[in-house]
Amino acid sequence: MSYSLNSTVLKPLSNKKPENAVILCHGYGGDGKDISLLASYWRAYLQDTVFICPDAPEKCAASPTGFQWFDLMDQSQEQILSKSLVAEKKLNDLIDEVKLQNNLVANQIIIGGFSQGCMLSLQTGIKRKDKINSIIGYSGKIIDTDHLSKNINSRPKIILMHGDSDQVVTIDAFLEAKDFFAKNKYIIETKIFENCEHRIPTEGSSLGLQFIKKNLY
C-alpha cells in the first residue's frame, strides 16, 4: 500500500488484516523513520495494529535532511496558522487513505505525534467531522486557540504529555492546551514528566501504549 505522504509503515505482527491504525507525526526537522522507533516498541504489544509514520510534506527550513509540517522560521502567528491549514488538509487526506486502504472506520484510528506533529494532530483531530478514536500528544501545543475554538467538530479522547523542563515548547503551552480542552468538555488525560526536556521519556512511551490498548483493544 502507498500513501500520498511518503510513510514508514509497520504492518500488524499478526499478519492479519489490521483491526485498527495509529498514525504518528514526527516533530520539526524529523521524519517518519524517527518516530517509527516509538511505533516499533508499541507494535509488539498491539499485534493487530498497522502503524503509519509519514514524512511531513515540506523539506525543513532549518534542517535540510529533515521535514516540516509547516514553516516556523521568522513567521507571524497568522502565517503559521495559514500554513498549518495546508498541512492539516494533507493529514486529513492521509487519514482518509488509511481508512480506505485498510477497510477501517474513523473510530478505529488514533492519530498523534511529537512537538509539531502533536500540534498538527490536535488541530486536525478536533476539526475533523468524521471523528477519529483518540489523539496522543507529546510535547506540543494548540497552534491557535481562537481558531480551534471556532472550529470544534468532534470530541475524540485525548492524552497530552510534556516535560516540565522543556525549553522548546514550554510547559505553559501544555497548561494552556489542558485548560482549553477542559473548558470545552473533552475527555482528557495529562501527564507532566519531572526533569524532562523536549523528548519522549520511557514513561511517556509506556503511557501512550496503555492509552492505545484502552481505546482500541
What does each of the following model-derived ranges do?
Residues 113-117, 121:
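Gly/Ala-rich beta-loop-alpha elbow adjacent to hydrolase catalytic centers
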Residues 37, 123-127:
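Active-site signature of alpha/beta-hydrolase-fold catalytic machinery across serine-
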Residues 130-142:
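A conserved short beta-strand
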Residues 36-40, 170-180:
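Short alpha-helix in the alpha/beta-hydrolase fold that links the catalytic acid
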Residues 2-104:
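Serine-hydrolase catalytic machinery in alpha/beta-hydrolase-like enzymes
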Residues 103-113:
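Alpha/beta-hydrolase fold nucleophile elbow
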Residues 175-217:
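C-terminal catalytic histidine-bearing segment of alpha/beta-hydrolase fold enzymes
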Residues 159-162, 166:
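Short beta-strand/loop motif that positions the catalytic acidic residue
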